[in-house]
Protein backbone atom coordinates (compact mmCIF):
# COMPACT_ATOMS: atom_id res chain seq x y z
CA UNK A 1 0.00 0.00 0.00
CA UNK A 2 2.86 2.39 0.80
CA UNK A 3 4.29 1.83 -2.69
CA UNK A 4 0.94 2.74 -4.26
CA UNK A 5 0.59 5.83 -2.08
CA UNK A 6 4.13 6.96 -2.86
CA UNK A 7 3.49 6.46 -6.57
CA UNK A 8 0.28 8.52 -6.37
CA UNK A 9 1.97 11.29 -4.41
CA UNK A 10 4.83 11.47 -6.89
CA UNK A 11 2.66 11.40 -10.02
CA UNK A 12 -0.52 13.13 -8.87
CA UNK A 13 -0.08 16.17 -11.15
CA UNK A 14 0.33 13.89 -14.18
CA UNK A 15 -2.72 11.83 -13.17
CA UNK A 16 -4.80 14.98 -12.66
CA UNK A 17 -3.62 16.47 -15.97
CA UNK A 18 -4.72 13.30 -17.81
CA UNK A 19 -8.11 13.59 -16.11
CA UNK A 20 -8.44 17.22 -17.25
CA UNK A 21 -7.67 16.21 -20.84
CA UNK A 22 -10.37 13.54 -20.57
CA UNK A 23 -13.05 16.15 -19.82
CA UNK A 24 -13.92 17.14 -23.42
CA UNK A 25 -14.17 13.46 -24.39
CA UNK A 26 -16.39 12.71 -21.38
CA UNK A 27 -18.64 15.66 -22.23
CA UNK A 28 -18.96 14.60 -25.87
CA UNK A 29 -19.83 11.05 -24.75
CA UNK A 30 -22.48 12.51 -22.42
CA UNK A 31 -23.92 14.60 -25.27
CA UNK A 32 -24.18 11.61 -27.60
CA UNK A 33 -25.80 9.49 -24.86
CA UNK A 34 -28.37 12.20 -24.09
CA UNK A 35 -29.14 13.33 -27.64
CA UNK A 36 -29.07 9.97 -29.42
CA UNK A 37 -30.03 7.45 -26.74
CA UNK A 38 -31.79 9.61 -24.13
CA UNK A 39 -29.65 8.00 -21.39
CA UNK A 40 -29.17 10.23 -18.34
CA UNK A 41 -26.57 8.34 -16.29
CA UNK A 42 -23.64 7.70 -18.64
CA UNK A 43 -20.15 6.18 -18.54
CA UNK A 44 -18.89 9.77 -18.23
CA UNK A 45 -20.87 10.23 -15.02
CA UNK A 46 -19.47 6.95 -13.71
CA UNK A 47 -15.88 8.00 -14.46
CA UNK A 48 -16.41 11.30 -12.63
CA UNK A 49 -17.83 9.46 -9.61
CA UNK A 50 -14.83 7.09 -9.65
CA UNK A 51 -12.45 10.06 -9.78
CA UNK A 52 -14.31 11.66 -6.87
CA UNK A 53 -13.75 8.47 -4.86
CA UNK A 54 -10.08 8.58 -5.92
CA UNK A 55 -9.84 12.17 -4.62
CA UNK A 56 -11.28 11.08 -1.27
CA UNK A 57 -8.78 8.23 -1.07
CA UNK A 58 -5.89 10.52 -1.97
CA UNK A 59 -6.79 13.20 0.59
CA UNK A 60 -7.51 10.75 3.42
CA UNK A 61 -4.89 8.04 2.93
CA UNK A 62 -2.09 9.66 0.92
CA UNK A 63 -1.81 13.28 2.07
CA UNK A 64 -3.54 12.77 5.45
CA UNK A 65 -3.84 16.49 6.26
CA UNK A 66 -6.11 16.90 9.29
CA UNK A 67 -7.78 20.07 8.02
CA UNK A 68 -8.78 18.31 4.76
CA UNK A 69 -10.04 15.23 6.61
CA UNK A 70 -12.11 17.39 8.99
CA UNK A 71 -13.71 19.19 6.04
CA UNK A 72 -14.43 15.88 4.29
CA UNK A 73 -16.03 14.47 7.46
CA UNK A 74 -18.21 17.60 7.62
CA UNK A 75 -19.27 17.14 3.98
CA UNK A 76 -20.02 13.43 4.56
CA UNK A 77 -22.05 14.12 7.73
CA UNK A 78 -24.05 16.77 5.92
CA UNK A 79 -24.63 14.39 2.98
CA UNK A 80 -25.97 11.67 5.30
CA UNK A 81 -28.37 14.08 7.03
CA UNK A 82 -29.46 15.50 3.65
CA UNK A 83 -30.35 12.01 2.41
CA UNK A 84 -32.12 11.11 5.68
CA UNK A 85 -34.27 14.24 5.34
CA UNK A 86 -35.25 13.16 1.83
CA UNK A 87 -36.27 9.72 3.07
CA UNK A 88 -38.09 10.89 6.21
CA UNK A 89 -39.92 13.98 4.94
CA UNK A 90 -40.97 12.92 1.44
CA UNK A 91 -43.76 10.51 0.56
CA UNK A 92 -42.25 9.32 -2.71
CA UNK A 93 -38.48 10.03 -2.67
CA UNK A 94 -36.26 9.33 -5.65
CA UNK A 95 -33.07 8.31 -3.85
CA UNK A 96 -31.02 7.76 -7.02
CA UNK A 97 -31.76 11.24 -8.37
CA UNK A 98 -31.10 12.86 -4.97
CA UNK A 99 -27.70 11.12 -4.69
CA UNK A 100 -26.77 12.17 -8.23
CA UNK A 101 -27.72 15.81 -7.53
CA UNK A 102 -25.90 15.78 -4.20
CA UNK A 103 -22.71 14.46 -5.84
CA UNK A 104 -22.88 17.23 -8.44
CA UNK A 105 -22.96 19.81 -5.63
CA UNK A 106 -20.25 18.41 -3.34
CA UNK A 107 -17.92 17.95 -6.33
CA UNK A 108 -16.86 21.62 -6.09
CA UNK A 109 -15.74 21.75 -2.43
CA UNK A 110 -14.00 18.36 -2.65
CA UNK A 111 -12.19 19.23 -5.90
CA UNK A 112 -11.13 22.56 -4.35
CA UNK A 113 -9.59 20.76 -1.36
CA UNK A 114 -7.87 18.41 -3.77
CA UNK A 115 -6.44 21.08 -6.09
CA UNK A 116 -5.24 23.19 -3.17
CA UNK A 117 -3.43 20.13 -1.83
CA UNK A 118 -1.79 18.93 -5.04
CA UNK A 119 -0.80 22.42 -6.26
CA UNK A 120 0.90 23.12 -2.94
CA UNK A 121 4.67 23.05 -3.64
CA UNK A 122 4.04 21.39 -7.01
CA UNK A 123 4.22 23.06 -10.39
CA UNK A 124 1.21 22.88 -12.71
CA UNK A 125 1.83 23.90 -16.31
CA UNK A 126 -0.91 26.36 -17.28
CA UNK A 127 -0.37 25.53 -20.93
CA UNK A 128 -2.13 22.24 -20.21
CA UNK A 129 -5.20 24.18 -19.09
CA UNK A 130 -5.07 26.31 -22.24
CA UNK A 131 -4.75 23.16 -24.36
CA UNK A 132 -7.91 21.71 -22.79
CA UNK A 133 -9.71 25.01 -23.47
CA UNK A 134 -8.67 24.90 -27.14
CA UNK A 135 -9.89 21.29 -27.44
CA UNK A 136 -13.29 22.37 -26.12
CA UNK A 137 -13.37 25.32 -28.50
CA UNK A 138 -12.42 23.22 -31.53
CA UNK A 139 -15.23 20.75 -30.77
CA UNK A 140 -17.63 23.69 -30.91
CA UNK A 141 -16.00 25.65 -33.74
CA UNK A 142 -15.52 22.84 -36.30
CA UNK A 143 -19.03 21.28 -35.96
CA UNK A 144 -20.61 24.75 -36.12
CA UNK A 145 -18.62 25.64 -39.25
CA UNK A 146 -19.86 22.48 -41.00
CA UNK A 147 -23.37 22.67 -39.44
CA UNK A 148 -23.12 19.23 -37.84
CA UNK A 149 -23.29 20.31 -34.20
CA UNK A 150 -26.14 19.75 -31.76
CA UNK A 151 -28.72 22.51 -31.30
CA UNK A 152 -28.31 24.84 -28.33
CA UNK A 153 -32.06 24.82 -27.77
CA UNK A 154 -34.65 22.08 -28.10
CA UNK A 155 -37.16 24.41 -29.75
CA UNK A 156 -37.92 28.01 -30.77
CA UNK A 157 -34.46 29.59 -30.50
CA UNK A 158 -31.42 29.11 -32.73
CA UNK A 159 -27.77 28.25 -32.08
CA UNK A 160 -25.39 25.30 -32.05
CA UNK A 161 -23.33 23.94 -29.17
CA UNK A 162 -20.96 21.84 -31.29
CA UNK A 163 -20.67 18.27 -30.02
CA UNK A 164 -21.63 19.22 -26.46
CA UNK A 165 -24.93 19.20 -24.60
CA UNK A 166 -25.44 22.44 -22.65
CA UNK A 167 -24.83 25.84 -24.26
CA UNK A 168 -24.78 27.47 -20.82
CA UNK A 169 -22.21 25.04 -19.41
CA UNK A 170 -19.84 25.13 -22.40
CA UNK A 171 -20.28 28.91 -22.75
CA UNK A 172 -19.40 29.40 -19.08
CA UNK A 173 -16.38 27.08 -19.22
CA UNK A 174 -14.92 28.86 -22.25
CA UNK A 175 -15.69 32.31 -20.82
CA UNK A 176 -13.99 31.61 -17.48
CA UNK A 177 -10.66 30.32 -18.85
CA UNK A 178 -10.39 32.61 -21.90
CA UNK A 179 -9.27 35.83 -20.08
CA UNK A 180 -6.15 34.11 -18.76
CA UNK A 181 -5.20 32.71 -22.18
CA UNK A 182 -5.73 36.12 -23.80
CA UNK A 183 -3.49 37.74 -21.17
CA UNK A 184 -0.81 35.13 -21.87
CA UNK A 185 -0.89 35.88 -25.62
CA UNK A 186 -0.90 39.66 -25.03
CA UNK A 187 2.01 39.56 -22.56
CA UNK A 188 4.10 37.33 -24.84
CA UNK A 189 3.13 39.47 -27.88
CA UNK A 190 1.96 36.50 -29.94
CA UNK A 191 -0.17 38.65 -32.24
CA UNK A 192 -0.98 36.05 -34.91
CA UNK A 193 -2.08 33.46 -32.33
CA UNK A 194 -4.10 36.14 -30.54
CA UNK A 195 -5.92 37.18 -33.73
CA UNK A 196 -6.68 33.57 -34.69
CA UNK A 197 -7.88 32.77 -31.18
CA UNK A 198 -10.12 35.87 -31.00
CA UNK A 199 -11.67 35.06 -34.39
CA UNK A 200 -12.50 31.52 -33.26
CA UNK A 201 -13.70 32.78 -29.85
CA UNK A 202 -15.94 35.42 -31.45
CA UNK A 203 -17.44 32.92 -33.89
CA UNK A 204 -18.23 30.48 -31.07
CA UNK A 205 -19.88 33.17 -28.93
CA UNK A 206 -22.11 34.34 -31.77
CA UNK A 207 -23.13 30.86 -32.94
CA UNK A 208 -23.89 29.48 -29.46
CA UNK A 209 -26.93 31.75 -29.37
CA UNK A 210 -26.76 32.54 -25.62
CA UNK A 211 -26.48 36.00 -24.05
CA UNK A 212 -24.22 35.47 -21.01
CA UNK A 213 -20.97 34.59 -22.88
CA UNK A 214 -21.37 37.79 -24.94
CA UNK A 215 -21.61 39.81 -21.72
CA UNK A 216 -18.51 38.05 -20.39
CA UNK A 217 -16.56 38.84 -23.57
CA UNK A 218 -17.59 42.51 -23.27
CA UNK A 219 -16.10 42.66 -19.77
CA UNK A 220 -12.74 41.43 -21.11
CA UNK A 221 -12.96 43.84 -24.06
CA UNK A 222 -13.76 46.85 -21.84
CA UNK A 223 -10.79 46.10 -19.58
CA UNK A 224 -8.31 46.11 -22.47
CA UNK A 225 -9.82 49.31 -23.92
CA UNK A 226 -9.52 51.05 -20.52
CA UNK A 227 -6.00 49.69 -20.08
CA UNK A 228 -4.92 51.03 -23.49
CA UNK A 229 -6.65 54.43 -23.15
CA UNK A 230 -5.25 55.14 -19.67
CA UNK A 231 -1.74 54.14 -20.75
CA UNK A 232 -1.88 56.32 -23.86
CA UNK A 233 -3.12 59.32 -21.86
CA UNK A 234 -0.42 58.81 -19.21
CA UNK A 235 2.25 58.65 -21.94
CA UNK A 236 0.66 61.61 -23.81
CA UNK A 237 0.41 59.53 -26.98
CA UNK A 238 -2.59 61.44 -28.30
CA UNK A 239 -2.17 60.46 -31.95
CA UNK A 240 -2.26 56.78 -31.00
CA UNK A 241 -5.27 57.53 -28.80
CA UNK A 242 -7.16 59.05 -31.75
CA UNK A 243 -6.25 56.01 -33.89
CA UNK A 244 -7.42 53.67 -31.11
CA UNK A 245 -10.73 55.52 -30.67
CA UNK A 246 -11.35 55.56 -34.43
CA UNK A 247 -10.55 51.85 -34.68
CA UNK A 248 -12.82 51.17 -31.71
CA UNK A 249 -15.76 53.03 -33.32
CA UNK A 250 -15.26 51.20 -36.63
CA UNK A 251 -15.01 47.88 -34.79
CA UNK A 252 -18.26 48.55 -32.90
CA UNK A 253 -20.09 49.51 -36.11
CA UNK A 254 -18.78 46.42 -37.92
CA UNK A 255 -19.71 44.22 -34.95
CA UNK A 256 -23.27 45.57 -34.89
CA UNK A 257 -23.63 44.73 -38.59
CA UNK A 258 -22.07 41.28 -38.10
CA UNK A 259 -24.22 40.42 -35.07
CA UNK A 260 -27.43 40.93 -37.10
CA UNK A 261 -26.41 37.89 -39.18
CA UNK A 262 -25.91 35.51 -36.24
CA UNK A 263 -28.08 33.12 -34.18
CA UNK A 264 -27.43 35.39 -31.18
CA UNK A 265 -29.29 38.26 -32.88
CA UNK A 266 -32.01 35.95 -34.22
CA UNK A 267 -32.67 34.75 -30.67
CA UNK A 268 -32.94 38.33 -29.41
CA UNK A 269 -35.55 39.07 -32.10
CA UNK A 270 -37.45 35.83 -31.35
CA UNK A 271 -37.48 36.66 -27.64
CA UNK A 272 -38.59 40.28 -28.18
CA UNK A 273 -41.38 39.16 -30.53
CA UNK A 274 -42.49 36.53 -28.02
CA UNK A 275 -42.75 39.23 -25.32
CA UNK A 276 -44.48 41.57 -27.84
CA UNK A 277 -41.92 44.33 -27.30
CA UNK A 278 -42.66 47.21 -29.67
CA UNK A 279 -40.34 49.85 -28.19
CA UNK A 280 -37.41 49.86 -25.76
CA UNK A 281 -39.48 51.29 -22.89
CA UNK A 282 -41.68 48.16 -23.04
CA UNK A 283 -38.73 46.16 -21.74
CA UNK A 284 -38.64 47.95 -18.40
CA UNK A 285 -41.32 46.02 -16.59
CA UNK A 286 -40.52 43.39 -13.98
CA UNK A 287 -42.19 40.70 -16.08
CA UNK A 288 -40.22 41.52 -19.25
CA UNK A 289 -36.91 41.99 -17.42
CA UNK A 290 -37.40 38.58 -15.81
CA UNK A 291 -38.17 36.92 -19.15
CA UNK A 292 -35.67 38.74 -21.37
CA UNK A 293 -32.67 39.21 -19.05
CA UNK A 294 -33.08 36.30 -16.61
CA UNK A 295 -34.92 33.77 -18.80
CA UNK A 296 -37.83 33.56 -16.29
CA UNK A 297 -35.42 32.56 -13.53
CA UNK A 298 -36.89 35.08 -11.08
CA UNK A 299 -40.31 33.45 -11.54
CA UNK A 300 -38.80 30.00 -10.96
CA UNK A 301 -37.09 31.35 -7.83
CA UNK A 302 -40.37 32.75 -6.51
CA UNK A 303 -42.13 29.40 -6.98
CA UNK A 304 -39.33 27.37 -5.35
CA UNK A 305 -38.88 29.89 -2.54
CA UNK A 306 -42.58 29.55 -1.66
CA UNK A 307 -42.07 25.78 -1.40
CA UNK A 308 -38.99 26.44 0.75
CA UNK A 309 -40.95 28.75 3.09
CA UNK A 310 -43.68 26.14 3.57
CA UNK A 311 -41.17 23.34 4.28
CA UNK A 312 -40.27 22.12 7.77
CA UNK A 313 -37.29 23.40 9.76
CA UNK A 314 -35.07 20.41 8.85
CA UNK A 315 -35.63 21.00 5.13
CA UNK A 316 -34.87 24.70 5.55
CA UNK A 317 -31.59 23.83 7.26
CA UNK A 318 -30.56 20.79 5.18
CA UNK A 319 -32.34 21.46 1.89
CA UNK A 320 -35.47 20.65 -0.09
CA UNK A 321 -33.68 18.13 -2.27
CA UNK A 322 -34.42 17.78 -5.97
CA UNK A 323 -37.45 15.48 -6.17
CA UNK A 324 -40.88 16.39 -4.79
CA UNK A 325 -44.38 14.93 -5.15
CA UNK A 326 -43.30 12.33 -7.68
CA UNK A 327 -41.45 14.67 -10.04
CA UNK A 328 -38.12 16.45 -10.47
CA UNK A 329 -38.19 19.99 -9.09
CA UNK A 330 -37.55 22.81 -11.55
CA UNK A 331 -34.18 24.44 -10.85
CA UNK A 332 -33.92 28.23 -10.75
CA UNK A 333 -30.70 27.88 -12.81
CA UNK A 334 -28.96 30.48 -10.64
CA UNK A 335 -26.39 28.35 -8.86
CA UNK A 336 -26.16 30.25 -5.58
CA UNK A 337 -29.94 30.26 -5.16
CA UNK A 338 -30.29 26.61 -6.21
CA UNK A 339 -27.66 25.50 -3.70
CA UNK A 340 -29.34 27.51 -0.94
CA UNK A 341 -32.86 26.22 -1.66
CA UNK A 342 -32.10 22.60 -2.51
CA UNK A 343 -29.15 22.02 -0.16
CA UNK A 344 -30.35 24.23 2.68
CA UNK A 345 -28.58 26.77 4.88
CA UNK A 346 -26.03 24.27 6.22
CA UNK A 347 -25.41 22.82 2.76
CA UNK A 348 -24.92 26.30 1.29
CA UNK A 349 -22.27 27.14 3.91
CA UNK A 350 -20.43 23.80 3.67
CA UNK A 351 -20.48 23.58 -0.13
CA UNK A 352 -19.42 27.18 -0.79
CA UNK A 353 -17.22 27.99 2.24
CA UNK A 354 -13.83 27.23 0.60
CA UNK A 355 -15.03 28.75 -2.69
CA UNK A 356 -16.05 32.07 -1.11
CA UNK A 357 -13.00 32.13 1.17
CA UNK A 358 -10.69 31.76 -1.84
CA UNK A 359 -12.47 34.43 -3.87
CA UNK A 360 -12.47 36.83 -0.90
CA UNK A 361 -8.71 36.43 -0.47
CA UNK A 362 -8.01 37.06 -4.17
CA UNK A 363 -10.27 40.14 -4.32
CA UNK A 364 -8.79 41.50 -1.09
CA UNK A 365 -5.24 41.07 -2.41
CA UNK A 366 -6.10 42.62 -5.79
CA UNK A 367 -7.98 45.68 -4.54
CA UNK A 368 -5.46 46.30 -1.75
CA UNK A 369 -3.03 47.43 -4.46
CA UNK A 370 -5.61 48.27 -7.10
CA UNK A 371 -3.63 50.97 -8.94
CA UNK A 372 -0.64 48.74 -9.62
CA UNK A 373 -2.64 45.53 -10.04
CA UNK A 374 -5.00 47.08 -12.61
CA UNK A 375 -2.04 47.54 -14.96
CA UNK A 376 -0.86 44.00 -14.31
CA UNK A 377 -2.64 42.25 -17.17
CA UNK A 378 -2.22 38.77 -15.73
CA UNK A 379 -3.64 39.64 -12.30
CA UNK A 380 -6.48 41.70 -13.76
CA UNK A 381 -7.34 38.81 -16.08
CA UNK A 382 -7.53 36.49 -13.08
CA UNK A 383 -9.96 38.81 -11.30
CA UNK A 384 -11.99 39.23 -14.51
CA UNK A 385 -12.13 35.44 -14.82
CA UNK A 386 -13.55 35.18 -11.29
CA UNK A 387 -16.10 37.95 -11.95
CA UNK A 388 -17.16 36.11 -15.11
CA UNK A 389 -17.54 32.83 -13.20
CA UNK A 390 -19.73 34.59 -10.61
CA UNK A 391 -21.87 36.18 -13.33
CA UNK A 392 -22.26 32.88 -15.18
CA UNK A 393 -23.16 31.05 -11.96
CA UNK A 394 -25.73 33.71 -11.14
CA UNK A 395 -27.18 34.42 -14.59
CA UNK A 396 -27.14 31.04 -16.35
CA UNK A 397 -26.32 28.39 -13.75
CA UNK A 398 -24.67 25.06 -14.66
CA UNK A 399 -21.32 26.24 -13.26
CA UNK A 400 -20.86 25.37 -9.58
CA UNK A 401 -23.04 22.26 -9.57
CA UNK A 402 -21.87 20.86 -12.91
CA UNK A 403 -18.70 18.73 -12.41
CA UNK A 404 -17.58 19.29 -16.02
CA UNK A 405 -17.33 23.02 -15.27
CA UNK A 406 -16.69 23.13 -11.51
CA UNK A 407 -13.46 21.12 -11.86
CA UNK A 408 -12.07 23.98 -14.00
CA UNK A 409 -13.40 26.57 -11.55
CA UNK A 410 -11.39 24.76 -8.86
CA UNK A 411 -8.21 24.66 -10.95
CA UNK A 412 -8.51 28.33 -11.94
CA UNK A 413 -9.20 29.57 -8.41
CA UNK A 414 -6.25 27.69 -6.92
CA UNK A 415 -3.91 28.96 -9.66
CA UNK A 416 -5.09 32.53 -8.99
CA UNK A 417 -4.84 32.10 -5.22
CA UNK A 418 -1.27 30.81 -5.45
CA UNK A 419 -0.31 33.67 -7.78
CA UNK A 420 -1.42 36.30 -5.25
CA UNK A 421 -0.08 34.31 -2.30
CA UNK A 422 3.43 34.31 -3.77
CA UNK A 423 3.72 38.06 -3.23
CA UNK A 424 3.11 37.92 0.51
Please provide the spans of the model-predicted regions.
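Aromatic-anchored transmembrane helix interface
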Residues: 45-50, 71-83, 93-118, 132, ...
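A membrane-periplasm/extracellular boundary helix in multi-pass inner-membrane enzymes
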Residues: 228-286, 308-311
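Membrane-interfacial helix-loop-helix modules of multi-pass inner-membrane proteins that assemble, modify
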Residues: 29-37, 87-95, 138-170, 264-274
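Transmembrane alpha-helices of multi-pass inner-membrane enzymes
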Residues: 382-424
Amino acid sequence: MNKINNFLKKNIITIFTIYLFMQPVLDIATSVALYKFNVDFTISSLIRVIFLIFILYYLIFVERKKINIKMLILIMLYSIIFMLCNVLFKDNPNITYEIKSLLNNIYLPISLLFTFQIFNNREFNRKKLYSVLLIYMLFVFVPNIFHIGFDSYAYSKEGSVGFFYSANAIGSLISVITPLLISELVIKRKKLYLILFLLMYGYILLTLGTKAPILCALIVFIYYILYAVINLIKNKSYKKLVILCTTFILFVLASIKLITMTPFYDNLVIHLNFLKIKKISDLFTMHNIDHFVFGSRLSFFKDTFNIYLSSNIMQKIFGLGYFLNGKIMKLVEMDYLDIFLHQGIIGFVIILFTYFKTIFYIFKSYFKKFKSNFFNIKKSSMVISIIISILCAFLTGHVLATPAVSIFISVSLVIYYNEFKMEE
